[in-house]
């Protein structure tokens, strides 16, 4: 996924 400064599921990175 993309490198964003938004927490996705808990990880503050584009790691879904």
Swiss-Prot record:
EC number, UniProt record: 1.4.1.2
The protein, known as: NAD-specific glutamate dehydrogenase
Keywords, sorted A to Z: NAD, Oxidoreductase
Protein family (similarity comment): Belongs to the Glu/Leu/Phe/Val dehydrogenases family.
Superkingdom to which the source organism belongs: Eukaryota
Principal EC category: oxidoreductase
Active-site residues, as the UniProt record annotates them: 12
Keyword NADP: no
Catalytic activity: L-glutamate + NAD(+) + H2O = 2-oxoglutarate + NH4(+) + NADH + H(+)
GO molecular function: glutamate dehydrogenase (NAD+) activity
